[in-house]
Amino acid sequence: MSGEYDDLKRRMDGAIAAFKHDLASLRTGRASSNLLDAIQVQAYGTTMPINQVANVTVPEPRMISVSIWDKSMVGAVDRAIRESNLGFNPIVDGTNLRIPLPELNEQRRKELVKISHGYAENARVAARHVRRDGMDFLKKAEKDGVISEDDQRKRSDQVQKLTDETISTIDHLLSDKEAEIMQV
């Protein structure tokens, strides 16, 4: 039975990790190489992530630098960044692109907070799905006579506690990100 609990814990941790990754992709006014993670580039007849055709670094707090490995890919990477709806305007400098980050206005900050709330809700839903799977497993185990009713209740309480801790972590991460976004 502890194997199932460990699996639930791993899946809950996965929901938190996915939420952290989503939050990292939100632009908060500070440069981060994660901001470009979602950008796909048309390269060599296929679509690939930007980090497979270039090196993304942050030389300054408000600047992202993209060092493209193949000179023929400069135009494709530039186009992918401009068309990404992130509001970036790269400056081409040989095989490097420099991306200055403008200040976020109040409206954009509120939009980002709203987006982060959506990410948080998706993470909470994922945690609840894991809880439901755990509860269903326990009910089936009790019905099949593998565990007693008391064991089922005790383990259900453990699953609920794990879910509450996961949702609490998600809420804490969300409030930290909100504060970071709204910081002027």
Swiss-Prot record:
InterPro entries reported for this sequence: Ribosome_recyc_fac, Ribosome_recyc_fac_dom, RRF_sf
Taxonomic superkingdom: Bacteria
Disulfide bridge partners, by residue number: none
Compartments in which it is found: Cytoplasm
Swiss-Prot/TrEMBL GO biological process terms: cytoplasmic translational termination
Keywords, ordered alphabetically: Cytoplasm, Protein biosynthesis
Protein family (similarity comment): Belongs to the RRF family.
The protein's name in its UniProt record: Ribosome-recycling factor
Species of provenance: Mesorhizobium japonicum (strain LMG 29417 / CECT 9101 / MAFF 303099)
